[in-house]
Regions:
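Flexible gly/pro-rich beta->alpha loop and the following alpha-helix that scaffold active-site loops
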Residues: 1-34
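Catalytic nucleophile loop
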Residues: 26-50
Length: 197
């Protein structure tokens, strides 16, 4: 799992290049991969797709609707609101399958091969993380398209249960329990550790 961060997939720092080399090896080996936000953008760029800011300067900071595509319906059974915090999006890499789309940044979730996924949104973010981000990066809340701190916290109250349910279902699909093991030992349980609070 490669999470998000304030850097860009287009940055030329050595650690960004190293991360992309790692992603390339993981994809070639068909190792299960999940890229969240920056992690999805790095996967897309590794595969030759463009990562760029919105043409009109819009950001997605807050809750935005995702719409499933026909191939995405098993993982995205219905439209849903998802938490976002990004200024760049990714073009769909050649050979990737678009699973969910959005109105501002069209490519919101994709699959490459059998078990590599990139998602632009942040299902892992807790309320504590949301509050911290909205405080430390308050300057971004005035960017075009960004939602206020209050709107984000209200969105959390309205949409978070469904987003957590989606995350549990997705992780159990992506990393199913071992034979005979209860679902609590699955990938969903792995992201429920205190480190994510």
């Amino acid at each position: 799992v490669i999470f998000g961060g304030p850097m860009s997939a287009n940055d030329e720092q050595p650690y960004i290049r190293d991360e992309m080399k790692l992603i390339e090896r993981l994809l070639k080996a068909e190792t299960p991969y999940l890229g969240i936000c920056l992690g999805a953008q790095l996967m897309a760029r590794t595969l030759g797709a463009r990562v760029a800011e919105h043409g009109e300067g819009f950001r997605e900071v807050g809750y935005y609707e995702l719409t499933p595509t026909a191939p995405g319906c098993p993982l995205f059974p219905r439209p849903m609101m998802a938490y976002q915090w990004h200024r760049e999006g990714f073009d769909l890499p050649d050979g990737a399958t678009l699973l969910a789309k959005g109105n501002v940044f069209p490519n919101q979730a994709c699959r490459v091969g059998r078990n590599a996924y990139g998602i632009q949104f942040h299902p892992e973010v807790t309320e504590a993380m949301n509050r911290r981000w909205a405080t430390r990066a308050a300057h971004m809340l005035s960017d075009p398209g960004a939602q206020s701190r209050e709107a984000q916290l209200e969105g959390r109250r309205l949409y978070d249960d469904a987003l957590r349910e989606w995350l549990d279902s997705f992780l159990d699909h992506w990393l199913p329990p071992l034979d005979g093991a209860p679902a609590a030992t699955s990938g969903a349980a792995a992201l429920r550790q205190p480190a994510f609070s």
